Amino acid sequence: MSPIPERAKLHIAMVVFQTGYAGNHVIMRYALNLGVSKLVFPLYRTIVAFSVLAPSAYFLEKKERPAMKISFLIQFFLLGLVGITLNQGFYIFGLDNTSPTFASATENVVPAVSFLMAALLGIEKVEWKRKDGIAKVVGTIVSVAGSLVITLYKGPTIYQPSLNIVNQTIKPEEAEEENKNWTLGCLCLMGHCLCWSSWIVLQSPLLKKYPARFSFVSYSCFFAVIQFFGISAYFERDLERWKIISGGELYALLYTGLVGSAMVFAIQIYVVERGGPLFVSAYLPLQTLIAAVLATLALGEHFYLGGLIGAILIMSGLYLVVMGKSWENQALCQQQQHMISSAASDFGDEEDYHNNKPRSPISQPLISS
């Protein structure tokens, strides 16, 4: 038995998830500045993720993998389309026309959208009159508010690093503003958030029918590779755009493929299965905080009062959501214990009735044999 409690594993997994994905925004922006194809790069990224996930699924889930059905294949195809192909496509076009900070900030609507979708579909139970339901709703709102504070309010500088760990060679974004379509970027990022929310929520019911997690994400990646290849082959006819021509592009590809896709997909589906879709989406605002801290430590950017206030709100919101889930589990356990006690009591009453039932005064048969 593992010395680490199950709930602690979920929290650690989501912190690792958000830390890795916070760097994904900066790495993707770097790759776009290098001039990678916005269609071919996601294809290569998904191939890298698939090449890691598929062997894991084959060797680790040989005996656990359920028999494949046509209905499963259709659902995996749709999950690959919504959760990977459209999700990454909208994201990369949105990031190309906005900025990493803005892209990270818009993703903070995912908890609210996921929560609403899960509640409407009955996947996430919300008891509005109980403290656990109120805590989950308020916690989600507070976390989103904290991430918006980090994005929209700077305030005075409270920490100024003495040196930059990373020497920035990327040209300032202001120099590229004339090439950006901000409206298109916002619309694409809205599509990205809607796809991500749908992906998180729709994984939960299918996982109950197909609980092999690595196989689950491998099939989704497989269909996404086919979809990306078809789209790229049709729209990207220049073979030069299919080449990886620099070490920077290769580094960006490996990071986004191994960390931004393979690791993120594996952790996400693990936590969706064990903690539910709300648990996954509730941690997304933490990404904005981590991105701000990484920018301060690695790029020498100032840390502002708004970042501190936002951090406090995000952590408070996460605490409320976690406590809400804990109270919900306690309520479920109490309900189960009450049902068991009631059933045992009913069984005992029936047993007493049979034991104490009046016996017939006739001790001999009416007709002798």
From Swiss-Prot:
GO cellular component terms attached to this protein's record: membrane
Pfam families hit by this protein: EamA (PF00892)
Membrane spanning residue stretches: 12-31, 39-59, 72-92, 103-123, 133-153, 182-202, 214-234, 252-272, 278-298, 303-323
Cell compartment(s), UniProt: Membrane
GO molecular function term, any single one: transmembrane transporter activity
Domain EamA: 24-150, 194-323
Main location: membrane
SUPFAM superfamilies found in the cross-reference section: Multidrug resistance efflux transporter EmrE
InterPro entries xref list: EamA_dom, WAT1-related
Region of interest (Disordered), ranges: 348-369
Keywords: Membrane, Repeat, Transmembrane, Transmembrane helix
Membrane topology term: Multi-pass membrane protein
Family indicated by similarity: Belongs to the drug/metabolite transporter (DMT) superfamily. Plant drug/metabolite exporter (P-DME) (TC 2.A.7.4) family.
Protein name, per record: WAT1-related protein At3g53210
